[in-house]
């Protein structure tokens, strides 16, 4: 089965088969963490920008570490270190990134819909790493992965969601 999606913006855009493929791929890569040398050439030659315009510890460090272990070249910036503090718009920032011919932009922003705006203004793949209270598909996938690892299946399960969204206000 092939994965035919360019972006990861909203988990509801994916079929059950897509999600299973993502989880199975993650499991296959998880063994890299057990190696003495925790690096594979999967993304060698690819450039990823982590544009975190909202504070993040776990999500940002997880992306940065995964990119390094998959041999991607990455650029990390956001918030007060960008020209947005001088009034530059998200679209202007994305247009600058487009000039660098990057392959993927990981977006974390407090504004709902920001990752979607990036998809409309860049040829690069876009991954939503959270957009305020709106969406956090990578967290949803991590939660599903944990359930899948422990239960082996999602069918017939009831779930309660407790979040720390107040921290994102």
Where are these regions (language model features)?
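Nucleotide donor/acceptor-binding cores
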Residues: 46-48, 156-159
